[in-house]
């Protein structure tokens, strides 16, 4: 929806090739505009004045997303302005909007290298500004934090990533970047959200997802406690940069999905939604986390769930694992395993290598 809340943009794909047609609807008049933008990505971003949209387009032969255009509402697609084109087919392009709603980020990425450009939402036809030129084995992303930009970066062999502060002048020299949260061998940083006075970090510690809060006022970094030994979580529905709280999803092998709200100032945690599961009583089940030795003597974490009172030595077990593409196998709620548990099975999830459960090295090794 446009910033003035008058227009809605949406994408249609009728071929299955993920080449979308963007259409624009006037919400007050309840009718479609004549604008039709074909063979593009569906994630368009509005300019601040609601007069332009910025979108990505794929190469017609390779289908690699490699072009960024600006479209003026009410004009033909042939008049759209090309503002960036990537010539290296190893890189893919995608768009993102800053949490402050001031910038559009253009990300150019491949597996081990990235580059970010800034576009001012107040001036979508203006010049792009490079954050930091791409280099081999350097992955970074940025977020606006008001007075500064903040970057997640693996610069200088920080495989588990660190958080760095960037002055809004001179950030094209990485020597000017200031380390805020140092790289830790025990913590793999996956995501961050900037707020007016805080940064919320989603990390992994010993293979388990955690949330940490960095307070600008005293430079403290504190972890939020969770109720279960193993679980799954994720940051959700946090669009307001000036908010005093954030929301996150949570579930475990014995806790049905829920959404919680965490107050950044008084450090309170409240459940605001929970999925009701018929005939499921969480206190009937037990969850544990163990580690087992692989053939090369590496400890592999395994989460298990079973019904209380079960004879574990003689019970059958169903074990699940997937290790590829850095995909994590977290211990979230699975209603499909309840019948097995009630019949005396143990269910286990192994966090095998190939995922990034234990950090970047877990994937690379």
Where would I find each of the regions flagged by the language model?
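Conserved beta-propeller blade repeats
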Residues: 1-11, 38-56, 88-107, 134-153, ...
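Cap/lid segment of the alpha/beta-hydrolase catalytic domain
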Residues: 11-19, 28-33, 227, 262-268, ...
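A flexible loop/linker signature enriched in serine peptidases of the S9 family
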Residues: 12-21, 36-40, 56-67, 76, ...
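Multi-bladed beta-propeller domains
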Residues: 15-17, 24-42, 58, 71-92, ...
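Conserved blade-register residue in beta-propeller folds
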Residues: 24, 70, 118, 165, ...
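Structured, non-catalytic alpha/beta "coupling" segments that mediate domain-domain communication
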Residues: 148-155, 160-161, 241-272
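C-terminal substrate/ligand-recognition segments
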Residues: 154-156, 188-206, 292-301, 340, ...
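C-terminal structured "cap/appendage" subdomains that terminate the fold
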Residues: 193-260
């Amino acid at each position: 929806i446009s910033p003035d809340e008058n227009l809605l943009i949406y994408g249609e794909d009728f071929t299955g090739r993920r080449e979308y047609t963007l259409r624009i609807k006037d919400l007050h008049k309840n009718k479609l505009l004549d604008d039709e933008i074909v063979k593009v990505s569906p994630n368009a971003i509005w300019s601040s004045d609601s007069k332009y949209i910025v979108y990505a387009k794929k190469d017609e032969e390779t289908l690699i997303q490699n072009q960024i255009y600006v479209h003026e509402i009410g004009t033909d697609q042939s008049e759209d302005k090309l503002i960036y084109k990537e010539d290296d087919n190893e890189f893919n392009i995608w768009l993102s909007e800053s949490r402050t709603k001031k910038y559009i980020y253009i990300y150019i990425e491949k597996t081990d290298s990235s580059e970010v450009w800034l576009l001012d939402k107040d001036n979508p036809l203006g010049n792009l500004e490079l954050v930091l030129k791409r280099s081999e084995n350097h992955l970074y992303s940025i977020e606006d934090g008001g007075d500064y930009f903040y970057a997640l970066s693996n610069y200088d062999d920080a495989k588990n990533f660190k958080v760095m502060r960037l002055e809004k002048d001179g950030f094209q020299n990485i020597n000017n970047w200031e380390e805020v949260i140092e790289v830790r061998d025990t913590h793999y940083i996956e995501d961050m959200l900037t707020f007016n006075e805080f940064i919320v970090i989603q990390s992994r510690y010993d293979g388990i997802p955690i949330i940490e809060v960095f307070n600008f006022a005293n430079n403290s970094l504190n972890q939020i406690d969770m109720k279960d030994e193993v679980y799954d979580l994720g940051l959700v529905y946090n669009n307001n940069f000036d908010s005093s709280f954030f929301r996150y999803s949570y579930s475990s092998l014995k806790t049905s999905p829920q959404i919680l709200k965490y107050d950044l100032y008084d450090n309170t945690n409240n459940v605001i939604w929970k999925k009701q599961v018929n005939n499921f009583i969480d206190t009937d089940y037990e969850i544990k986390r163990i580690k087992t030795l692989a053939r090369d003597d590496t400890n592999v974490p395994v989460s298990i769930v079973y019904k209380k009172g079960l004879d574990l030595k003689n019970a059958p077990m169903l074990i699940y694992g997937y290790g590829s593409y850095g995909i994590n196998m977290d211990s979230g709620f699975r209603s499909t395993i309840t019948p097995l548990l009630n019949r005396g099975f143990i269910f286990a999830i192994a966090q095998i290598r190939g995922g990034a459960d234990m950090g970047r090295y877990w994937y690379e090794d």
